[in-house]
Each structure stands twice: as structure tokens, then as C-alpha cells.
Amino acid sequence: MAEVKDQLEIKFRLNDGSDIGPKLFPDATTVATLKETVVAQWPRDKENGPKTVKDVKLISAGRILENNKTVGDCRSPVGNFSGAVTTMHVIIQHQVTEKEKKKKKPKGDLKQNKCVCLCFGARC
């Protein structure tokens, strides 16, 4: 019974409404490890899946979870009932590499502020 208390059953809700899990994780499991699980278990038939842990953001109880936090740190004081499954929402944000940044921004394209003055009347 003590083992169940020190674990949290988590399912990961994807953007299309499908789920990965649920699966039991010990309280000492880090958010980074949860993200590794999402990357490893991402359905192969789904497009735009995460390539690395850096592409994944996990949201629980309205908060974006930090990689160094543990499952125990992320427990909500309200709503974690014995045997209840915790749903974490998965957001995929692919990291833009320096090469891609340069490709998107044409060389010599500097932002220029332009002011235009229009006069509609006898005095200007």
C-alpha cells in the first residue's frame, strides 16, 4: 500500500484528444523523465511528433512543468485521490535551429520605420 501512495498514475493527453498511458510513476521521477517517456511512446502514425525532450512541454493543473521538478513536486493538493489518474497535457513546440532562423530571415532585410505625412487642407 505504501508503494501506491508514493506513486502517481499519469496519462498524457495529446493535442488531438488521444492519450499515452496511463502509467505509474514514482514520486521521485523528474519531469524530464516524463518527457522522455512521451517521446519514446509517441504514436508513430501521428504527424509532427517530438524529436527530442526539448520539443515537449507538459502542463498539469494549468502550470507548465519544469524539467528539474519531480512528480511529487507536481502533485496537486486538491484532486489527487487514491487510485485517480492524473492527466498531463502535452504541447509540442519544435525547437528552431540557428540554421533555420537564418533561412527564415533574409539577409539585408532590416526593419525600417517609415513615417508618412498627409495634408488634407489649405494649411500644412
Swiss-Prot record:
Residues 8-74 form the Ubiquitin-like domain. It is a lipid-anchor. It comes from the Eukaryota. It is found in: Cell membrane. GO terms for cellular component: plasma membrane. Acylated protein. Probably modified with palmitate. The keyword Membrane applies. Changing residue 119 to S: Loss of membrane localization. Changing residue 115 to S: No effect on localization. Induction: Not induced by pathogens, cycloheximide and ozone treatment. A lipid is attached at residues 115, 117, 119, 124 (S-palmitoyl cysteine). Gene3D superfamilies: Phosphatidylinositol 3-kinase Catalytic Subunit, Chain A, domain 1. Keywords: Cell membrane, Lipoprotein, Membrane, Palmitate. InterPro entries: MUB, Ubiquitin-like_domsf, UBL3-like, UBL3-like_ubiquitin_dom. Ubiquitous, but three fold higher expression in stamens. Its main location: membrane. Heat stable and remains soluble at temperatures exceeding 90 degrees Celsius. May serve as docking site to facilitate the association of other proteins to the plasma membrane. This is Membrane-anchored ubiquitin-fold protein 2. It comes from Arabidopsis thaliana (Mouse-ear cress).
